[in-house]
Structure formats: structure tokens, C-alpha cells
UniProtKB/Swiss-Prot annotation:
Domain of life per record: Eukaryota
Keyword flag Zinc-finger: no
Species of provenance: Schizosaccharomyces pombe (strain 972 / ATCC 24843) (Fission yeast)
Subunit structure: Interacts with skp1.
Presence of the UniProt keyword Cell membrane in the record: no
Organismal lineage: Eukaryota, Fungi, Dikarya, Ascomycota, Taphrinomycotina
GO biological processes: SCF-dependent proteasomal ubiquitin-dependent protein catabolic process
Domain F-box: 105-157
The protein's name in its UniProt record: F-box protein pof7
Length: 361
């Protein structure tokens, strides 16, 4: 047993014998966890509680962490040394020699490299359409120079652009896309495909909003400050419909069930624990201009309709304005964007079942 292991085992024995120290360390670990999650008020209370139980809890915790880190480093070094010795043993074994009949003929050229570029482009286009995932482009390009050269062809990106029009990622006709190609993108289909703003259907957009709120206390010198975190969720569908949801629930609990098929998402009396805070999702419609300006319209109540005006910037939706419209008087009321943060797209693989659009990486 090494010196570090001896020290660590002695420290752990001391902790196990001291009940108060063990309790203080548990409070200290909970405080660190709360601080990482952003619950500053809760973490401060747990830090105070830990120091009340045992005044040296911080130094003991740091000493234990340091010893555990040293132990892990020693174990990794031992594993690396064992692996290197095993490699040396394998390399010392003589490899079998090939006979003349078994020798490898390195001059054989794969048949696919003999194909003309036009035929290869047709094959690649059909394969990628069947896979429904353009992320495979980079993997295919890395296989050989022939594929890398073929994937630079502008005609291939033209078919991708037509596919984007068919999948409603651009709410434009093919004719208007071709006109825009000449006016803005120097007749380069590749430039148009890579730079033109598009909507995404294979995931959802998430906005993480935070603000500080003063708390209450019996004494003025010890007034707590709460960090409030809530999330805005937005999911688009190819038929110009969308789901809007605002909640304090984290993405891990919401995203997998964020679908029109989930009826509990739209019911305020839902028994589902992840939607039990009284918030319900709202269905609305979305539209996007050729320049990437997006409008999200959804009814907040029988009296008011909310409108989110956003600008598409890659995987982000930047806020332009947020206002409500009175359904009877058409009076508009601007809402401040103080706490609102940009939506960021997050891909969700389970969304492919009810989204028929071409997936983008």
C-alpha cells in the first residue's frame, strides 16, 4: 500500500469515528452541489450549517479531496505503465511472414474510384437522402481525396437546397430561392446552403433566463439574495406550428417529453411530476422571412396574444422584441427584454419520429 493510500485510509477512519465531522462533511458536499446548480442562497445556508457542526470542515474536506486526487493519479500511472509493458511484450513477438501467394497487392484500385464524378455525385446524393442526415458529409469526405473533391461540387449543394425547401426549413418557393442565389450569394449553392438562415425541426430551442431577487430576513445585515433561473422552450414543426413553454424545470426533465403527442404538457391539472408547477405549454404558429426574421405567435389567454420577434443567427434565435396584442382592441404592449436571453438550439435524437425534416448536424 502506498503512502497516499495510508494517509487516505487514516483520514477516512478518523471521519468515520467522529459523527459530527461526518455530518459536517455531508452538509459541505451538499453546499458545493447547490452552488454548482446556481442555488446560491441554499448553498450559503448549508455552508453555515456545516461550519456550525464542525469548524474545521473546510480544511478537512480539501485535504480528503487532495488525497483522493493523488490516489487516482497514482492508479492511472500504474495502469499506463502496465499497458506499456504489455505493448512491449506484444511487439517483441515475431509477426508471421507472408508467402508469395499471400502477399498483398497494393496496386489494386477500389472500383468506386474508377467511377466518373457525375455518377459518384448521384450516388452520394441518393445515399445522403436515404440517411436523412447531412452530418455524414464530413465523415465521407475524410475517407479519401476522391470523395472530398466530389463533396465540393456545387450541384450537390443545389439538391440539398431543394431538399430544404421541400422540408419547409425555408418558407420560400424554389423560384424565390433561385432569385436569391443570384442576388445575394454569387450563384454559389454551397454558400447559400451554409449561410442562409434556416429553421430546425430535429431539436428544440432553449433560452436560459436568470435574475436576482432580494429575499427577506429578520436582520437587515443578513438579507439573502436569490438567484432565480427559469427556461423558455420553443419547438418548431414543418407545418408552421410550434410549442412554447416557460418553466423552472430543467431541460433534462422537459426536452424528452416536449411534443404535441404529450397531452399532459398542455393540461394544468397534469399528474406528471415534471409539469406539476402549474405551467402549461401553448401551441402557436411561426413564420420566417428570407432574411431570417422569425415571428412566434401564440395565444396567452382569451384576451391576449403574445408575439415573439426573433432573428435567426446560426443555432441561435436573438430577441428583437416581445409584445402582447389585445384580441378585442388590437392594442399592443411592449414587454421588456431585461431577463430574456437568446434561444440556443439543442438537437434531440428522439424528435426524429414525429419530425419528417432532414436532420442537420
Amino acid at each position: 500500500m502506498s503512502t497516499v493510500e495510508d494517509q487516505l485510509s487514516l483520514e477516512l477512519e478518523t471521519v468515520n469515528k467522529d459523527i459530527l465531522l461526518k455530518k459536517a462533511l455531508l452538509h459541505y458536499k451538499d453546499a458545493i452541489k447547490s452552488e454548482r446548480e446556481g442555488n446560491l442562497g441554499e448553498s450559503l445556508n448549508k455552508y453555515r450549517l456545516a461550519h456550525k457542526v464542525h469548524e474545521d470542515v473546510e480544511s478537512i474536506y480539501r485535504r480528503l479531496e487532495r488525497l483522493q486526487l493523488c490516489k487516482r493519479n497514482e492508479e492511472e500511472e500504474m495502469l499506463n505503465s502496465d499497458a506499456s509493458e504489455a505493448m512491449l511484450t506484444v511487439s517483441s513477438v515475431p509477426s508471421p511472414t507472408l508467402t508469395e501467394n499471400e502477399s498483398v497487392n497494393e496496386s489494386v484500385v477500389p472500383n468506386i474510384l474508377k467511377l466518373p464524378d457525375e455518377v459518384l455525385l448521384v450516388i452520394l446524393e441518393n445515399c445522403i437522402r436515404d440517411l436523412h442526415d447531412l452530418r455524414y458529409l464530413s465523415s465521407i469526405a475524410l475517407t479519401c481525396k476522391h470523395f472530398a473533391k466530389a463533396l465540393r461540387a456545387d450541384s450537390l449543394y443545389r439538391s440539398f437546397c431543394y431538399c430544404s425547401c421541400e422540408q419547409k426549413e425555408w418558407q420560400q418557393s424554389i423560384k424565390s430561392i433561385e432569385e436569391e442565389l443570384v442576388e445575394k450569394y454569387q450563384q454559389s449553392w454551397k454558400t447559400l446552403f451554409l449561410k442562409k438562415p434556416r429553421s430546425r425541426f430535429d431539436g428544440c430551442y432553449i433560452s436560459v433566463c436568470r435574475y436576482f431577487r432580494p429575499g427577506t430576513s429578520d436582520t437587515s445585515w443578513n438579507q439573502p439574495i436569490h438567484l432565480i433561473t427559469y427556461y423558455r422552450y420553443l419547438r418548431l414543426y414543418p407545418n408552421s406550428t410550434c410549442i412554447v413553454y416557460q418553466s423552472s424545470n430543467e431541460p433534462n426533465d422537459v426536452v424528452r417529453n416536449f411534443s404535441v403527442q404529450n397531452t399532459s404538457l398542455f393540461s394544468p391539472m397534469s399528474s406528471s411530476p415534471m409539469f406539476s408547477n402549474g405551467n402549461v405549454a401553448l401551441t402557436g404558429s411561426w413564420s420566417m422571412t428570407p432574411s431570417g426574421e422569425m415571428l412566434i405567435v401564440y395565444p396567452a389567454s382569451q384576451t391576449y396574444t403574445y408575439v415573439q420577434k426573433l432573428q435567426v443567427r446560426g443555432i441561435r434565435l436573438k430577441w428583437i422584441s416581445f409584445y402582447s396584442i389585445h384580441n378585442y382592441t388590437s392594442f399592443t404592449n411592449e414587454m421588456p427584454l431585461t431577463h430574456n436571453r437568446d434561444y440556443v438550439f439543442s438537437r434531440v435524437y428522439s424528435y426524429t419520429a414525429d419530425s419528417e425534416s432532414l436532420k442537420r448536424g
